[in-house]
Curated annotation (Swiss-Prot):
Assembly, per entry: Homodimer. Component of the mitochondrial transcription initiation complex, composed at least of TFB2M, TFAM and POLRMT. In this complex TFAM recruits POLRMT to the promoter whereas TFB2M induces structural changes in POLRMT to enable promoter opening and trapping of the DNA non-template strand. Interacts with mitochondrial RNA polymerase POLRMT. Interacts with TFAM.
Single GO BP term: rRNA methylation
Entry protein name: Dimethyladenosine transferase 2, mitochondrial
GO cellular component, one term: mitochondrial matrix
SMART domains listed in its UniProt record: rADc
Transit peptide: 1-44
Compartments reported by the entry: Mitochondrion
Species of the source: Rattus norvegicus
Enzyme class of the recorded protein, top EC level: transferase
């Protein structure tokens, strides 16, 4: 998927990310306030890269290299497994579908997928489940591969420490998985249950990977089918009609993906693997009350039209910054945000996207933010499109 970014028009190189991930921006397209004030005293070649804080990612990463501190849930009901197979495979030819299953545990869903004719790669982090999964593999006629690692910890980002380092490129290469163009269909489907404790943090991590076309998204428009809590689901799909739930994370996910609710699963359908190694039903464990909640199965399919000439894996970091800035004071007029964020004429920009100067960020829908960003990027009013206040407090959202 790197190829997608490299094929974009050359002019994007002047206003996009330079360096690894969202950690720095190239001054030719984004300037600090000091840069902008001194624009007449500096030559074009004097510009330099500056760090762009990954503020939502600054949560302590200590969890990544310690043993699992919370129980994990697995599908325990065969009827639920059959329903999941129907949701995952739909009406397509099962043999043409590759399913990556995260922490399958006892392998109830794994067996149901194999029985339906799907190809499965099981990523299992707990050693105790590996022997049973290996026995399934031996009887699966090459349709099952077992990888002993935690899928949610592959390709750690910059602050994270994972031992041993787990790299999707190496794993996928060993499995013979090849990248396809972003414009092609869905090459891989991922099924998993997001860990309750790190649910929001993982949604952010996956989002960064998606927009930067890193990790699993190097291979194309990978479809996620994830069980998440009702709380995070409501935030993920919120619009301005629910201002109490409408947040940056939901805006960015809705811009990136078609989000579809598949079904709700009662907590009694899951078994729980606790740290002591015992497998127990949720309803019998008073110590696991936090896991006694219904989960929502949500499909997140990256949009074929996500990336354009003006929004790409190279400049998505400034799009994130725009949305975060607007939600910092969501009830302030959008024109005030634009005057702080960009050097282009805000009145002209708002006119092009058919918004009034008095409109607020809280009233803007996800697609409005994308149109706003792309209109600014498309503007030829200035070489410098963005002003980045290095000293501003980009607080965690």
């Amino acid at each position: 998927m790197r190829g997608l970014a490299m094929r974009l028009p050359p002019r994007l190189a002047l206003s996009v990310l330079a360096g690894r991930g969202p950690s720095c921006i190239l001054g030719s397209g984004a300037a600090t306030r000091k840069d902008w004030q001194e624009r007449n005293r500096r030559s074009f070649s004097d510009l330099y890269t500056q760090p762009l804080p990954d503020c939502d990612f600054e949560e302590s990463s200590s969890w990544t290299h310690k043993s699992r501190s919370e129980p994990t849930r697995h599908i325990a009901c065969k009827k639920s497994a059959r329903n999941l197979v129907r949701d995952l495979l739909e009406h397509q030819n099962p043999s043409h579908q590759l399913i990556l299953e995260c922490n399958p545990g006892p392998g109830i869903l794994t067996g149901a997928l194999l029985k339906a004719g799907a190809r499965v790669v099981a990523f299992e982090s707990e050693k105790m489940f590996i022997p049973h999964l290996e026995s399934l593999r031996k009887n699966a006629d090459g349709e099952l591969q077992v990888v002993h690692c935690d899928f949610f910890k592959i390709d750690p980002r910059y602050q994270e420490l994972v031992r041993p380092d787990v790299n999707s490129h190496t794993i996928f290469q060993n499995l013979g998985i090849k990248a396809v163009p972003w414009s092609a269909g869905v090459p891989i489907k991922v099924f998993g249950i997001l860990p309750n404790k790190h649910e929001r943090r993982l949604l952010w991590k996956i989002l960064f990977d998606l927009y930067s076309c890193e990790s699993i998204y190097r291979y194309g428009r990978v479809e996620l089918n994830m069980f998440i809590s009702e709380k995070e689901f409501r935030k993920l799909i919120a619009t301005p009609k629910r201002p109490d739930l409408y947040q940056v994370l939901g805006v960015l996910w809705q811009v990136a993906c078609e989000i579809k609710f598949l079904h709700m699963e009662p907590w009694s359908s899951f078994s729980v693997h606790a740290e002591n190694g015992h497998l127990e039903k949720s309803k019998h464990s008073e110590s696991l009350n936090l896991l006694k909640q219904n989960l929502y199965l949500v499909r997140m399919t990256p949009r074929r039209t996500l990336f354009t000439e003006n929004l790409s894996p190279l400049n998505y970091d400034m799009f994130f910054h725009l949305v975060k800035h607007c939600f910092g004071k969501r009830n302030a007029p959008i024109i005030h945000h634009l005057r702080s964020l960009s050097t282009v004429d805000p009145i002209n920009i708002l006119r092009q996207i058919r918004k009034r100067p008095g409109d607020t960020a809280a009233k803007m829908y996800p697609h409005d933010f994308k149109r706003l960003f792309e209109t600014i990027e498309r503007s030829e009013d200035s070489v410098f499109k963005w002003i980045y206040d290095y000293c501003s407090d980009d607080s965690e959202l």
